[in-house]
Amino acid sequence: MCSTSVYDLEDIPLEDDDPNSIEFKILAFYARHHVFKNTPAVFSPKLSRTRSLSQKALGTWSTDSWTQVSLPCRGSPSSEKNISLGKKKSSWRTLFRVAEKEEGLPSSPKEIRAQGPQGPFPVERQSGFHNQHWPRSLSSVEQRLESEVVDSKVACIANRVAEIVYSWPPPDVIHSQGGSKLKERVSEILYFRFEGPCDSKNKDGEDQIISKIVELLKFSGDQLGREIKKDKALMSSFQDGLSYSTFKTITDLFLRDVDTRGESEVKARGFKAALAIDAIAKLTAIDNHPMNRMLGFGTKYLREYFSPWVQQNGGWEKILGISHEEVD
């Protein structure tokens, strides 16, 4: 589906989010520069940024590996076109789908649904359905960013998030594929993992669709967009847009599949915060609400689950290992 409304950012009243907040700005900048676009080789959409069960952990992600790479943080958005993240010293140890459950968080769509009166796909209807492709729907946010001086702090944080997200090595089975073979392989993996096409007409089918979206979030934004566009069940399920409860369910389940055992709290939560930003930016592609509404959902989610802790630990720059020299 990969479409949103054509309404401009300023045309839709924002509810729970503040477009001047640091969270909203980070999400908007990250969505524009690091998701759903023709990216440089280091951001190749051909690579899945997840880990398979058969892979062994490849060490830990040291603080040094965060601070050795210098990213462009000053100037206009055009400076992002030639980002070079360099070679990572080590890889984050993350095994998806072998996550240690954390206290207080539900572990499945059914469990999450049981906590509230709404089903897994409550929707908040708009007055109409607009079918515009992603590049066009993003234009309102791009225009706003182009007309403003880029906040160097926001740029540095968003770029560091991209560095963190793209530091994951892809699964060997997918890394060895290329071109059309890769696309076929990804589709095949998803098909057999979920035993055929998803059906949203019953609760089990709805849970399966949520699980498939969670799985797709582990791949590049471009790959996610292609798979959603091909799956009629997914497309029809989100025609009326996501509600915040469904948005939260998907994001919660995605983050639960990240294994951070053995790492310090700062590293573990900092890594999850980066993954949350990446997932939120991708989720704007499967919803038919105006883009700013989804960014608002993301802002609300970050404020609820990450921002208080981030501030208590020195701010976004501190937890992501960004030096003052990089921001100034």
From Swiss-Prot:
Membrane-spanning residues: none
GO MF terms, alphabetically ordered: protein kinase binding
Keyword Cytoplasm in record: yes
Cysteine disulfide partners in this protein: none
Gene Ontology BP annotations: apoptotic process; regulation of apoptotic process
Cell compartments where the protein resides: Cytoplasm
Sequence motif BH3, location on chain: 213-227
PTM (free text): Phosphorylated by MELK, leading to inhibit its pro-apoptotic function.
Main localization category: cytoplasm
Gene Ontology CC terms: cytosol; intracellular membrane-bounded organelle
Residue positions of motif BH2: 309-316
SUPFAM superfamilies in the cross-refs: Bcl-2 inhibitors of programmed cell death
PANTHER family: APOPTOSIS FACILITATOR BCL-2-LIKE PROTEIN 14, SI:CH73-248E21.1
Family: Belongs to the Bcl-2 family.
Known role: Plays a role in apoptosis.
Protein name: Apoptosis facilitator Bcl-2-like protein 14
Organism for this UniProt entry: Mus musculus (Mouse)
Organism lineage: Eukaryota, Metazoa, Chordata, Craniata, Vertebrata
